[in-house]
Amino acid sequence: MAVKRAPSKKPRPVEGRKPKKNPLFAAKIEHVDYKDINLLRTFISDRGKIRSRRVTGLTPQQQRQVAVAVKNAREMALLPFTSR
């Protein structure tokens, strides 16, 4: 038997969410370079994890480029693997 839930108190927006701004399109960057540490730090959380597409607003291709660039920068010791 299913239990009926009370309706949520907060009404949902009717029009939906507006898409996030793409930071790479805004900066007119076509290729992500692993040596551009300031750019890569915007896509890394304070714990050292790569942020998801939902958070960053990147396209799938750009997200893959960022992930590869971050991993290369970590191997070259330009970025830490974790933050303490």
Swiss-Prot record:
Instruction: Please provide, in alphabetical order, the Gene Ontology terms of the cellular component aspect for this entry.
Output: cytosolic small ribosomal subunit
InterPro entries, sorted: Ribosomal_bS18 (IPR001648), Ribosomal_bS18_CS (IPR018275), Ribosomal_bS18_sf (IPR036870)
Q: Which ranges are annotated Basic residues under compositional bias?
A: 1-11
GO terms for MF: small ribosomal subunit rRNA binding; structural constituent of ribosome
Q: List the disulfide bonds.
A: none
Q: Where is this region: Disordered?
A: 1-21
Q: Which UniProt keywords apply?
A: Ribonucleoprotein, Ribosomal protein, RNA-binding, rRNA-binding
Gene3D superfamilies in alphabetical order? Ribosomal protein S18
Q: Name one GO biological process term.
A: translation
Keyword Cell membrane, does the record have it?
no
Q: Which PANTHER family match?
A: 30S RIBOSOMAL PROTEIN S18, SMALL RIBOSOMAL SUBUNIT PROTEIN BS18M
What family is it from?
Belongs to the bacterial ribosomal protein bS18 family.
- What job does this protein perform? Binds as a heterodimer with protein bS6 to the central domain of the 16S rRNA, where it helps stabilize the platform of the 30S subunit.
**What do we know about how this protein assembles, alone or with others?**
Part of the 30S ribosomal subunit. Forms a tight heterodimer with protein bS6.
| Annotated protein name in UniProt | Small ribosomal subunit protein bS18B
Q: What is the lineage of its organism?
A: Bacteria, Bacillati, Actinomycetota, Actinomycetes, Mycobacteriales
